Structure formats: structure tokens, C-alpha cells
Amino acid sequence: MGCKIIIKDTSKIMDSKMNICIQGLKKFEEIKIILETNCFYNINAPMNWAENTFWQSEAIFLSDSNGIVSLEKSPSIGGDYTGIRSMGLFESLKAVTIVNKKHIGDLKHLPLNDVVSYKISVLSDEKLLAKTTFNRFYKKNNINHYDIQRDSWQGRVFYEESKNKKPAIIVLSGSDGGIEKAQNIAMMLSNQGFVTLAISYFGMNNQKSNLDRIPLENLEEALKYIQKLDFVNSTKIGIYGRSKGAEYSLLFLTKYDGIKCAVLNSPSDRVYEGLKGKRNSKHSSWTYGGKEISYKPFKIKEFIINKLMKKSSIDDCGVMDIENVRCPLLLISSINDEIWDSYSASINIMKKAKSYKKNIILTTELGHMNTISYLPNPRYKKYKTDKIYDEAVLSWENTLSWFINCLYFSHEF
């Protein structure tokens, strides 16, 4: 019997664990497994990296007495990771040839990027023994979508046709702008039975080009919109915000009711100065009622000192009225956040929020860029450690369980 690659992937969804088994090898044969893709939208990658960027990883294995290598049971003894880790080849993918892309500002021309195509090869002494291809997906095949265009925000709704009204989640990504990262997170959440609305609050055509004086009323309008959908349970709406999207979400929670629960990933407890390109805008990030929200200006000297001393700001400049927040609140933050001090911010939010249910998931090695399970994270490529990827799985699984428990099973108000 020749070498054969067995792909064991029941759901084929990007955040699900799978196994790859190699059969028909010689007893105790050393092999190299190579995983490749040039059809891959990676939420953790820079915005200008195209989906046809070439990614590759490899690992060395020794077959057992039956001539079998199983990624969930066999330890890698070399390559891009070592030890037993069934998703190690996926997590350790590296961008070998980066292809840059132009920004797409027109929502109707923005692709879903919901399919990822992989190629896997098995070699012994550099001789090819077997190869195969397979796909994984950001959303299930039965999830539909459509676009929304409003005066100052745009969105993409993901939903499964159903006779029952379902809970919904509003999804906001960070300072990169646009909707690409938000939509792929929204797709992942829709697989759990939620209607999801990914929002672009700046950076697309016919809306603000910079993260500067964005109206809080955008989220009020989005909430009212999703509450009126025939297939949505209007009393069970959650919100997910990451980075500046978490700041935007928390500010919304301080001034509006109607959100059943929230997950804030790498949050801030205060409003920071807006951005004009890569420079400070000299204005607030957000407005309310046509007026700028009080904000903390960016000061390079203070930033450097705080980074070196590992301290956070001790003033109250721009701190939100967190005491007004009452919905169940899950915070995900890092003690090594390289962008801002989400750890101290989370502690302050936990102390002040009046939520009847609240929790923090802390990461110690994974920093600010923390999205879904099993994605490679090029921001932390110098850290060759399993813990970064374990913390990504922990964070994402807690995100899913929080929304499921609060929106499907909780009867508290």
C-alpha cells in the first residue's frame, strides 16, 4: 500500500480542530509534511496583504510501528513547531511571498473571503510520497448575507434562514477601518446560530476616511435596524468589539440600553484621540449629539515613559462613565498588550461596571492582536511558543460560550 493522506475534518470550519493522518509509510520512517496556501484571508495579517499571499509551514515526524503519522497523536520533532499539536501546521504558517493589494472602498465589490484552500505534501528524503488539497471555510454553506448602506456606516448581515427568531451580534473591528476583519469574525459567530452584523464605521466609500469624530449614533441606528429584522429576537442583541471597536462598543454601552451582553477584546476604558492616517487628528475619535466626546490626547513622551515603566495613565482624562454599563460583560486583555494597557483598563472596567455578570480572560504572551482559533499570527512570529496559540483558542472559545450562554440560555435582564 502506498502513502495516503487522510483528512479528518468533520465541520471544515476555520475555528474547528481537525486531524491529518498519513498512512502507508514504512515503520519508523522520518517524513516531512508541508502545508501551503495562496488562497487565504488571515484576520491577523496586515490589511494590505492580499489573499493570494503565499503561506507555508513544515514539520518533521517519525512514523509509528504501523507506518502511521497522526498530527493529533504524533509529535513533531522539527520544523516550524515541535511536540504534539494537531493544528500546529496551521498556526505556524509563515508568509513566504507577500502580495500587496489595493484597498477596496466599495462594499458591493468587497469579496467575502470565506474559503481557504490548502495543499498538503508528504516527503521522505525530499522525495514526494503523496499530496492532496482541501478547503476550510469561515462560514457554513447555509449562511446567507446581504449589504447595508447608510449615511455614515455600512454593514454586512450574515444569517441562516429559519422560522425562529434568533439572537444577533453587532461586530466591530479596530483602527484598520473598513469591514474585512469584522466580516470574517461575524461569519465565525454566525456559524453558532446568531444573526451577525459586521459594521464599517470608517474607511469605505461615502463615509469618513479616518478614525476621527465618528458619531456614536451609528451604533444606535445599527441596533434599531437589527432589532426590526423579522428573523431577529429584538431582546437578545449582543455586541463584539475589538481594539478601537471595543472602545466604541464600551462608549455605546455607557449611553444606550438594548444590548443584552458584550465581549470587548483588547479594550480601553477611556476615549482616545482620533487618527488622521497615522497621525493624531487633534480631535476625539467619537461624537455624541454632534459634539466631540471628551478624550485623552496622545503625547509621545508620556507614551514612551509608560511603555518603558510598564505603567498606565493615572489621570481620568477621557475615562468613560463605566458605571452606566449593566449588561453581562466579558473582557479579553493581555498583560503584554503592545498597543495600549488593556489589562489596567479591564481592571478599571470590572471595578466600575454595574453588570450582574462579568469576567476577564487574561493572556500573558499573546498581545493586542487576538482573534480566532488556529490562525497564524505574524505579529508575534518571533515568539515560537505554543502558549500564544493556546491563548487564542482560550479567548475565542470563551467568546463563543459567553454569547451562547447570555443570548440563548440566560433569562436574566
Predicted regions and their residues:
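N-terminal cap/lid segment of alpha/beta-hydrolase-fold proteins
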Residues: C3-I13, M18-C21, K26-E29, W55, ...
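Short beta-strand element of the alpha/beta-hydrolase
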Residues: K165-G174
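Short amphipathic alpha-helix adjacent to the substrate-entry channel of hydrolases
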Residues: E180-I199
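Alpha/beta-hydrolase active-site loop
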Residues: S209-D230, Y248-L251, E397
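Alpha/beta-hydrolase fold nucleophile elbow
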Residues: F231-S243
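Hydrolase active-site cap/lid region
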Residues: L250-K307
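Short beta-strand/loop motif that positions the catalytic acidic residue
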Residues: V325, L331-S333, D337
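C-terminal catalytic histidine-bearing segment of alpha/beta-hydrolase fold enzymes
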Residues: S344, M350, S355-F413
